[in-house]
Amino acid sequence: MSAYGHGRHEHGQNFLTNHKIINSIIDLVKQTSGPIIEIGPGSGALTHPMAHLGRAITAVEVDAKLAAKITQETSSAAVEVVHDDFLNFRLPATPCVIVGNIPFHLTTAILRKLLHAPAWTDAVLLMQWEVARRRAGVGASTMMTAQWSPWFTFHLGSRVPRSAFRPQPNVDGGILVIRRVGDPKIPIEQRKAFQAMVHTVFTARGRGIGEILRRQGCFHHVQKHNHGCAREESTPRPYLPDCTPTTGSISSR
């Protein structure tokens, strides 16, 4: 069964209709390069303007009728519409850019798929506003963001009013831009160890990073990655290998 459910409304997609917001997303896409993979093109609000960028586009749409409609309406040979559930879609092993107005209730599942996938370089995603804020570390850093911070950067874009969608959701949307780090401070081979350490910091008891990690017997790993600059602080920091303090609280969500 598709993760998007059965009826179109059950797919969770709210169509973007505000041209100002559409143009702002296209402007962000213009700052990237390479082929584009679009998640859930829906009515083609982003697909059609992106077709004028002169780049190959693969639009992955779970709704068969909408996929056929976009195919008929798109004259550009650069646009390929694929009828599939994005969560089942195999991403290319070559550099590409991810773009999408994603179903709010599938945001976490889609982000997990993307963060585990190789090759793509940038992602411009429209999601629920509060989720975009948390993923960007605004107000409170999440464990997911902290666990992937050595390999990706998360930037919060503009807030999108709920009136910009049809049907109108109960909450505002927000733009999140994710970029893959070209020269990460921690090798990807050490991802599991690093993420386990971050999980410990977010879930274990203690007054600060130093105390928590010493109690767990892994403080020397932080010292190694920080080249001796790791130190105990009263507030845990989401990006452990970096000695630059950050502000805000943390959340395990």
Swiss-Prot record:
Residues 229-253 are annotated as: Disordered. It comes from Corynebacterium diphtheriae. Keywords: Antibiotic resistance, Methyltransferase, Plasmid, RNA-binding, S-adenosyl-L-methionine, Transferase. GO terms for molecular function: RNA binding; rRNA (adenine-N6,N6-)-dimethyltransferase activity. GO terms for cellular component: cytosol. Coiled coil: none annotated. PROSITE patterns: RRNA_A_DIMETH, SAM_RNA_A_N6_MT. This is rRNA adenine N-6-methyltransferase. The keyword Transmembrane does not apply. Involved in erythromycin resistance. The lineage of its organism: Bacteria, Bacillati, Actinomycetota, Actinomycetes, Mycobacteriales. NCBIfam families: Erm23S_rRNA_broad. One of its GO terms (biological process) is response to antibiotic. Its EC number is 2.1.1.-. It is an enzyme of class 2 (transferase). Belongs to the class I-like SAM-binding methyltransferase superfamily. rRNA adenine N(6)-methyltransferase family. Pfam families: RrnaAD. S-adenosyl-L-methionine binds at N14, L16, G40, E61, D85, N101. The gene is ermA. InterPro entries: KsgA/Erm (IPR001737), rRNA_Ade_diMease-like_C (IPR023165), rRNA_Ade_Mease_Trfase_CS (IPR020596), rRNA_Ade_methylase_Trfase_N (IPR020598), SAM-dependent_MTases_sf (IPR029063). It comes from the Bacteria. Residues 244-253 have a biased composition (Polar residues).
